[in-house]
UniProtKB/Swiss-Prot annotation:
Protein EC: 2.5.1.75
Cofactor entry: Mg(2+)
Function: Catalyzes the transfer of a dimethylallyl group onto the adenine at position 37 in tRNAs that read codons beginning with uridine, leading to the formation of N6-(dimethylallyl)adenosine (i(6)A).
Name the record gives this protein: tRNA dimethylallyltransferase
Any Pfam family hit: IPPT
UniProt cross-references to HAMAP family, sorted A to Z: IPP_trans (MF_00185)
GO terms of biological process kind: tRNA modification
Keyword Cell wall biogenesis/degradation: no
GO molecular function, one term: ATP binding
Binding site for substrate: 19-24
Species, as recorded: Shigella dysenteriae serotype 1 (strain Sd197)
Residues annotated as binding ATP: 17-24
Family to which this protein belongs: Belongs to the IPP transferase family.
Reactions performed catalytically: adenosine(37) in tRNA + dimethylallyl diphosphate = N(6)-dimethylallyladenosine(37) in tRNA + diphosphate
């Protein structure tokens, strides 16, 4: 697309970053100054009743800056990148029609990628094929299925861990249904985002600072009643660790503690480690992201001013 045709598109802002980097605080500050409306881009914040462990904006913050796409699913329900793209595009169109600018804030990089580049035309899930894969896994083990994936799609196999049955079964399912590999199909993007996007990433300047923030926030969550929150989910009886909601960092470790698999101290240690690993993956995504403007979360006023400098011209 030419620069001239891009300039005629409606404007949007992406505010991305690893967990515990101060994205929400900056987004709320920007809403006070710019004509923006916030859309959450977070695969954990979509779930109702999962507030403390996801660091969901509190009532006061939401009053100051309402976020769209929060609390839109029960923890028992799935929500895909395709679901997000559909919902986000609808919200963006609504915001643009009102003469304001969508500000998309969060850390689920797959959602940002799906929104920006479109989605590949992957086949829908087939219960019969999935059942056949699970039967084979029960008989031969997931390691065997991972070797099978290596033979047909070595690129996907290198990316998917043998202990990740959900992604492993999906990669094989796609191949069995379509005759094409997941790698082949995902190289064909769908429709690009029909917006002129200003992209920002916020993170502390050093990894040590981010690690400190993550540890502090995890302990803060525990002090705020995180265990009671997960106990309420645990007591429902219909939730389990195969669900994306319960696999969220922190929740999975607390769940293991409630099931008696690990001690409280192990839960805290593993929860912090899992959150650090998530942050590392998010930063890896962002380092390979084209056209992103980096902000230092340790200098919030400077970060705010840099955003205003880049996008200030679109606020009028």
């Amino acid at each position: 697309m030419s620069d001239i045709s891009k300039a005629s598109l409606p404007k949007a802002i992406f505010l991305m970053g690893p967990t515990a980097s101060g994205k929400t605080a900056l987004a709320i500050e920007l809403r006070k100054i710019l004509p923006v409306e916030l859309i959450s881009v977070d695969s954990a914040l979509i779930y109702k009743g999962m507030d403390i462990g996801t660091a969901k904006p509190n009532a006061e913050e939401l009053l100051a800056a309402p976020h769209r796409l929060l609390d839109i699913r029960d923890p028992s329900q799935a929500y895909s990148a395709a679901d997000f793209r559909r919902d986000a595009l609808a919200e963006m169109a609504d915001i643009t029609a009102a003469g304001r600018i969508p500000l998309l804030v969060g850390g689920t990089m797959l959602y940002f990628k799906a929104l920006l580049e479109g989605l590949s035309p992957l086949p829908s899930a087939d219960p019969e094929v999935r059942a056949r894969i699970e039967q084979q896994a029960a008989e031969q083990g997931w390691e065997s299925l991972h070797r099978q994936l290596q033979e047909v799609d070595p690129v996907a196999a290198a990316r998917i861990h043998p202990n990740d049955p959900q992604r492993l079964s999906r990669a094989l399912e796609v191949f069995f249904i379509s005759g094409k590999t997941l790698t082949e199909l995902t190289q064909t993007s769908g429709d690009a985002l029909p917006y002129q996007v200003h992209q920002f990433a916020i993170a502390p300047a050093s990894r040590e600072l981010l690690h400190q923030r993550i540890e502090q926030r995890f302990h803060q969550m525990l002090a705020s009643g995180f265990e009671a929150e997960v106990r309420a989910l645990f007591a429902r009886g219909d939730l389990h660790t195969d669900l994306p909601s319960i696999r969220c960092v922190g929740y999975r470790q607390m769940w293991s503690y409630l099931e008696g698999e690990i001690s409280y101290d192990e839960m805290v240690y593993l929860g912090v480690c899992a959150t650090r690993q998530l942050a590392k993956r998010q930063i890896t995504w962002l380092r390979g992201w084209e056209g992103v403007h980096w902000l230092d979360s340790e200098k919030p006023e400077q970060a705010r001013d840099e955003v205003l400098q880049v996008v200030g011209a679109i606020a009028g």
